């Protein structure tokens, strides 16, 4: 069984998606701990409702960034965490955590990387006028949404889309492909080779999902 540690800053809808997929039996995993940098995060309520241990770790209570991430890494190691899930963790992860969990930290980003990294990927896509948008599960490195790509899924982007309408469409795919990425990892079917993530699977499990035709 895979042991997960989750980092979240806000509502934690992807955290809930992982919980639901564990309960359904799709994922052979358990969540050992939720770590949040926000004492008001709704993710805390989700953890409480599912009897998941929660640690509220506020960066300003640590002398500097590295000590904060060393402490997080220590807490995860204490609980024998195999894979770290970033479920809306709104900080750039520090080197001490990345080094101790190399290729064992996954993030989901609401855009088709390498396009539109950073904050508000959906808004960037709407303003740019793209015809296809989507989401990306990737391993975390020291950059901002620059780590090796694991899975992507695409959705149509319409001319009358707002940030909210596009976000809603993308979020449904986030809740589908993040659990899939965790499942592939748990089954030992993911290998990293340079910038490429190789997946031992049927092709349809790893490709971009083709969006339907636009509204014409």
PLM features: residue spans?
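N-terminal Rossmann-like dinucleotide-binding module
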Residues: 1-42, 46
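Internal anion-binding site segments
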Residues: 5, 120, 194-216
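Donor/substrate-binding cores of folate-linked one-carbon enzymes
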Residues: 21, 87-200
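Short beta->alpha connector loops at strand-helix junctions that form conserved
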Residues: 55-60, 108
């Amino acid at each position: 069984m895979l042991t997960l540690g989750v980092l979240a800053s806000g509502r934690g809808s992807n955290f809930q998606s992982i919980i639901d997929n564990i309960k359904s039996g799709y994922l052979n995993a358990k969540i050992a701990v939720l770590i949040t940098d926000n004492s008001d995060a709704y993710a805390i309520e989700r953890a409480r409702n599912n009897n998941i241990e929660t640690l509220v770790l506020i960066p300003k209570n640590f002398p500097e960034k590295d000590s904060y991430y060393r402490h997080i890494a220590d807490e995860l190691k204490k609980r024998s965490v195999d894979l770290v899930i970033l479920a809306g963790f709104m900080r750039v992860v520090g080197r001490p955590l990345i080094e101790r969990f190399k290729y064992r930290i996954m993030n989901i980003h609401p855009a088709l990387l390498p396009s539109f990294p950073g904050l508000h990927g959906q808004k960037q896509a709407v303003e740019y006028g793209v015809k296809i948008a989507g989401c990306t599960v990737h391993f975390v490195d020291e950059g901002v949404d620059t780590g090796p790509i694991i899975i992507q899924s695409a959705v149509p982007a319409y001319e009358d889309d707002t940030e909210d309408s596009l976000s809603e469409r993308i979020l449904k795919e986030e809740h589908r492909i993040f659990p899939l990425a965790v499942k592939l990892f748990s089954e030992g079917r993911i290998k990293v080779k340079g910038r490429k993530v190789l997946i031992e699977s049927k092709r349809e499990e790893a490709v971009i999902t083709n969006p339907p035709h636009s509204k014409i």
